[in-house]
Design a protein with these regions (language model features):
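N-terminal pre-domain segments of enzymes
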Residues: 12-57
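Buried hydrophobic positions in well-ordered alpha/beta secondary-structure cores of metabolic enzymes
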Residues: 36, 158, 219-221
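Feature captures the catalytic cores and cofactor-binding loops of soluble hydro-lyases/lyases
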Residues: 48-55, 59-217, 231-280, 284-297, ...
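Channel- or pocket-lining gating/hinge segments that regulate access to a cavity or pore
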Residues: 226-229
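Short, solvent-exposed loop/turn segments at the edges of secondary structure
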Residues: 203, 223-224
Length: 307
């Protein structure tokens, strides 16, 4: 038995099993998708629209997760491009790893794939694995020419299955047609007229690297003009509540200064009464406020000791 990043690996898997994914994402307590990935709720994905990249970055950094953001600036040598820069994309991550073609390795992958019930291991495999709310995230080692992981036909299937788009450390083709596809978006290394060639799909739903980020299946991604940030699913609820409570506290302090709130009123008492106007249940908000009041400030120190 081999060990990979602390995980028991019986053999190379093309598509990681639900059991492997559950072990990989053991910190998640909640519903899972049939393939084993954490299923952050659609309601939480909606609430993340009000969370800025900076707020998410600061929250994760305080948790000791310092490598969750990838810059999409077009002014550096590692720049990326976005089909619709004005449109954000938020969803649950499905990962794929592509590697340079090596025929004996590809033969091996096809044999392993057959044992997993996969008829053919190619760039269609991740696409057929998508479900609504997923974002297809793939590492193709920055390949642009011949690294076109999809065109308009596969792009249409991606959107039909996920209602989202893609984030590729690789490229796409048929940009004009993709740009006309309402609701579809892509964060990629570039565009190229070539068809995909010289690549093998080495894994689906395994850990991959996107720029400076290690991405796990089931992460939640926020993709915007400035870049992409990958949020471990176990932190999503706390992040949202942190941002929403900070906004509540700002409103509370402002209304206190204006004399709209009595000086004897405590924030927690007032905040719980406001929960009906937010996407927060009273129980959820109350539990978070109590947790914040009693939580020791040791998380960052504990994480830092791993470095």
């Amino acid at each position: 038995m081999l060990l990979l990043a602390g995980l028991p690996v019986r053999s190379q898997l093309v598509k990681w099993t639900p059991e492997d994914i559950k072990l990989l994402t053991k910190d998640w307590v909640g519903e899972r998708l049939p393939d084993g990935r954490p299923k952050v709720s659609d309601a939480h994905l909606e609430r993340l629209k009000k969370v800025t990249i900076e707020e998410a970055w600061e929250f994760l950094r305080a948790k000791g997760y310092e490598n969750q953001f990838e810059n999409f600036s077009g002014t550096n040598e590692n720049s990326w491009v976005i089909i619709h820069p004005e449109q954000e994309m938020i969803g649950r991550v499905l990962t794929a790893q592509y590697m340079p073609m090596r025929f004996d390795f590809d033969d091996y992958l096809q044999e392993v794939g057959k044992k997993q019930g996969i008829n053919r291991v190619n760039n269609n495999l991740p696409v057929t694995s998508l479900s609504e709310g997923d974002v297809y995230v793939a590492d193709a080692f920055g390949k642009i020419a011949d690294g076109t992981l999809l065109g308009d036909a596969v792009g249409a299937t991606v959107f039909r299955n996920s209602k989202r788009g893609v984030i590729f450390n690789g490229s796409v083709r048929k940009l004009d047609a993709l740009a006309e596809m309402e609701g579809f978006n892509a964060w990629v290394r570039g565009f190229d007229p070539s068809s995909i060639s010289g690549l093998v799909c080495a894994s689906v739903n395994a850990p991959i690297r996107i720029g400076r980020v290690t991405v796990l299946p089931g992460d939640v991604v926020i993709a915007r003009l400035s870049g992409v940030i990958f949020i471990p699913p176990q932190f999503v609820t706390e992040l949202i509540l942190s941002v929403e409570v900070t906004a509540l506290r700002s409103t509370f302090n402002q209304q206190r200064r204006e004399g709209k709130i009595d000086n004897n009123t405590q924030f927690n008492e007032w905040a719980i009464k406001q929960s009906d106007d937010l996407h927060i249940s009273k129980a959820e908000l109350e539990a978070y406020l109590n947790q914040q009041a009693s939580q020791p400030q040791s998380t960052q120190q504990t994480r830092s000791q791993r470095q």
